[in-house]
């Protein structure tokens, strides 16, 4: 159980080898590995000794080994993880020896080469002390019999771990496979009183799955969290609860039993909400405790005693609208509080097949990021360490505080020292070779530099030549510019002199012209002054003559205006007379029409009365006859005849009554319908034949006026209906159908027509006239 804690190169190397075991090619077991294995065997002997002691006292063994395995495993795993990689060849040898010892006669003959024969479980495994010891020993790859048992039993665990191999890995020296085999296979425990191999396999599976839990959690959703043995992981296919494992299991009490039971399958359950609130998957506690599981509806409250809404209770006033607002606010607040409390109480499961809550996802993401950054940091440190190790130099002074100062442990063997020295020399050779390479590189670089410097010198000389040429050119250009500027100045001077001469000439000529013009103006003014005096005299005489003529014209105009006024007044009086005549004719016609209507109605009423009177008399007579008949024959008749007669009596009476009702209905209907049609019908009653030709104009006028009146009545009724029921929109109203413009237009049309035209119009019972009137009427705005 002793560990060498002194810092050494070997321990770090071994850690790195374990980490990179998958990547490295297969190695042969070295001298160092053999030396380490020798130490292992020494430790195994010690363990055997303690085991023998424990077997003698079975009572204490159960108690002590309850705690022992965890301590032993924690103590020894440090060594095992460092040194298991090297424990291949001799372990293999010891296991084969032990197999030969422990194998009884009934071993199967046909065993494949790569596998070892399965021995039956030794008697020591039946005792309660052994499983614990085996577990403790196997974690650190301890005692030979235990090792063989563990390896042989771990063969069925190949189904679980993808990298686990059989004993062939030990033979071939595949170190990574051997480590996998030891890690996955040996952390088993044989239960008490297990005679057959089946039960051991079962527990091996359970333990192997637990180990896989710890190592291979890359598939599970929360791979950043460490999975403890027995913790809930839905990716494990066969889940064994703690109650199924035996009480002698070495891991029985290492995990607390206080965790609640978690189901293997989370079924999706519906939570009724409105669409705005997210739905979370139910918590695992939902299955065990139904009291807390509530659905979060819009109005639902977690307060069981619900108070009825009180209008007096609101603070914002007693009117209904504010009360409604208050109620709405309350509902939304309760919904919010319900949701928050529900989320607090039922936090979603870590892996749910349903939607995970966004805040939970954020937590998970942050944890994952932390884990990744930590891993990156570790990897970086490891790489830095490796680089330092590569640079390791023998000539380092011991004063420098370097990790790799050779503090050799006392128990290091010669082989190990020899190997270390070999390695260091190879490293030195490599570094010298590298130095040589670097020197060659430096030489090459210096040659290139020399070449480049030569090129630069040549370029510089070229550049200087170019600069000289440029200066020459610039000088020439400056001289040219000077020459050109002088020439331009001379030209300008000449031009200005020329212009000045021309200006002087022009000004002299202009002055002469101005003097001449002034002289002319003076002459003209003298002439004008003499002429105006004579002109004024003539103008005055003309003006007086004109004035007298104008006065005469004014007198004439006033006379003409008076005459025009008289004529206009006469025309006005004539038009007024015509209008009055028209109105008289209209009123006479209207009165005649009304008289006609009244006569018509009176006649109808009389006829109706007569008809009704006759019918009533008939009815009365029939009733009387019936009564008399029924009195006479009531005693002589049978019931059948009576009923027959009754039917006979009923039918004509009912027929009569129905016909009477129908006639009444018809009359009333026709009356109501003809109320608005009568005038237009009466227009068509006129016939042209018997009248005189001189009477045609008056007949046409009568017909026209009738038409217009009918139109007016229809229009008025329509306007009335419109006002009552607002049939058309509010802006559109029917006029009463008879505006002054319409009447005037129609009458003018007809007063101007000749008789032949009127005859044509009135032919065919006045149909042409109706059509004509329709066209006129539609043309005029009502």
Swiss-Prot record:
Keywords: Coiled coil. Residues 312-324, 337-346 have a biased composition (Polar residues). Residues 1-127, 205-234, 308-355, 629-689 are annotated as: Disordered. Residues 669-678 have a biased composition (Basic residues). Residues 361-628 form a coiled coil. Disulfide bonds: none annotated. Residues 82-118 have a biased composition (Low complexity). Residues 24-54, 326-336, 629-668, 679-689 have a biased composition (Basic and acidic residues). This is Uncharacterized protein YALI0A18139g. It comes from Yarrowia lipolytica (strain CLIB 122 / E 150).
């Amino acid at each position: 159980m002793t560990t060498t804690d002194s810092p050494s190169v070997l321990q770090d190397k071994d850690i790195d080898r374990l980490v990179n075991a998958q990547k490295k090619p297969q190695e042969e077991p070295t001298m160092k590995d053999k030396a380490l294995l020798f130490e292992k065997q020494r430790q195994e002997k010690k363990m055997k000794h303690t085991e023998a002691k424990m077997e003698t006292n079975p009572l204490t063994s159960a108690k002590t080994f309850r705690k022992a395995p965890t301590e032993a495993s924690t103590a020894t795993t440090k060594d095992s993880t460092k040194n298991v990689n090297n424990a291949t060849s001799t372990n293999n040898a010891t296991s084969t020896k032990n197999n030969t010892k422990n194998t009884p006669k009934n071993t199967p003959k046909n065993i494949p080469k790569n596998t070892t024969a399965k021995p039956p479980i030794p008697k020591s495994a039946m005792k309660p002390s052994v499983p614990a010891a085996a577990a403790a020993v196997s974690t650190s790859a301890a005692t030979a019999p235990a090792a063989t048992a563990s390896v042989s039993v771990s063969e069925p665990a190949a189904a679980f771990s993808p990298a686990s191999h059989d004993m062939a890995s030990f033979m071939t020296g595949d170190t990574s496979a051997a480590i996998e085999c030891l890690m996955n296979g040996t952390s088993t425990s044989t239960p008490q009183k297990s005679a057959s191999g089946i039960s051991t396999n079962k527990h091996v599976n359970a333990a192997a799955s637990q180990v896989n839990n710890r190592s291979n959690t890359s598939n599970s959703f929360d791979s950043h969290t460490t999975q403890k043995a027995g913790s809930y992981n839905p990716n494990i296919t066969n889940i064994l609860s703690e109650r199924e494992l035996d009480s002698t299991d070495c891991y029985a009490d290492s995990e607390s039993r206080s965790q609640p039971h978690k189901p293997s399958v989370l079924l999706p359950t519906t939570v009724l909400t409105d669409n705005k609130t997210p739905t979370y998957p139910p918590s695992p506690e939902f299955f065990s405790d139904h009291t807390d599981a509530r659905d979060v509806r819009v109005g639902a409250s977690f307060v069981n005693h619900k108070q009825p809404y009180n209008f007096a209770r609101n603070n914002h006033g007693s009117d209904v609208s504010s009360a409604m607002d208050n109620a709405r606010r309350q509902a939304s607040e309760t919904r919010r509080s319900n949701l928050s409390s529900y989320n607090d109480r039922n936090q979603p499961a870590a892996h749910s097949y349903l939607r995970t809550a966004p805040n939970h996802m954020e937590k998970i993401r942050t944890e994952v990021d932390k884990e990744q950054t930590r891993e990156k940091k570790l990897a970086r440190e490891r790489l830095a360490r490796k680089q330092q190790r590569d640079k390791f130099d023998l000539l380092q002074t011991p004063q420098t505080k370097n990790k790799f100062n050779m503090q050799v442990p006392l128990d290091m063997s010669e082989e190990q020292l020899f190997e270390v020295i070999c390695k260091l020399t190879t490293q030195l050779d490599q570094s010298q070779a590298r130095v040589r390479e670097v020197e060659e590189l430096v030489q090459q670089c210096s040659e290139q530099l020399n070449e480049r410097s030569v090129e630069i010198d040549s370029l510089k000389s070229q550049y200087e030549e170019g600069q000289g040429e440029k200066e020459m050119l610039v000088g020439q250009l400056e001289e040219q510019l000077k020459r050109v500027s002088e020439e331009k100045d001379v030209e300008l001077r000449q031009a200005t002199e020329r212009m000045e001469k021309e200006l002087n000439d022009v000004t002299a000529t202009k002055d002469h012209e101005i003097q001449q013009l002034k002289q002319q103006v003076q002459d003209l003014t003298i002439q004008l002054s003499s002429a105006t005096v004579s002109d004024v005299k003539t103008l005055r005489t003309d003006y007086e003559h004109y004035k007298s003529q104008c006065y005469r014209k004014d007198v004439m105009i006033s006379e003409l205006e008076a005459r025009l006024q008289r004529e206009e007044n006469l025309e006005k009086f004539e038009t007024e007379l015509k209008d009055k005549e028209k109105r008289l004719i209209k009123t006479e016609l209207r009165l005649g029409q009304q008289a006609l209507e009244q006569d018509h109605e009176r006649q109808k009423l009389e006829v109706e009365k007569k008809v009704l009177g006759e019918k009533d008399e008939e009815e009365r007579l029939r009733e009387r006859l019936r009564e008399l008949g029924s009195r006479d024959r009531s005693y002589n008749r049978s019931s059948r005849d009576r009923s027959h007669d009754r039917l006979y009596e009923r039918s004509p009476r009912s027929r009569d009554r129905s016909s009477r009702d129908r006639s009444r209905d018809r009359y009333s209907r026709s009356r109501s319908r003809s109320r608005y049609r009568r005038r237009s019908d009466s227009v068509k009653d006129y016939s042209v034949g018997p009248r005189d030709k001189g009477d045609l104009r008056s007949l046409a006028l009568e017909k026209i006026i009738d038409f217009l009146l009918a139109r007016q009545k229809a229009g008025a009724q329509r306007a009335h209906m419109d006002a009552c029921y607002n049939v058309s929109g509010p802006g559109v109203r029917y006029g009463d159908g008879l505006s002054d413009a319409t009447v005037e237009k129609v009458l003018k049309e007809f007063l101007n027509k000749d008789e032949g035209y009127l005859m044509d119009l009135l032919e065919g019972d006045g149909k042409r006239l109706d059509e004509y009137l329709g066209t006129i009427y539609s043309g005029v705005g009502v």
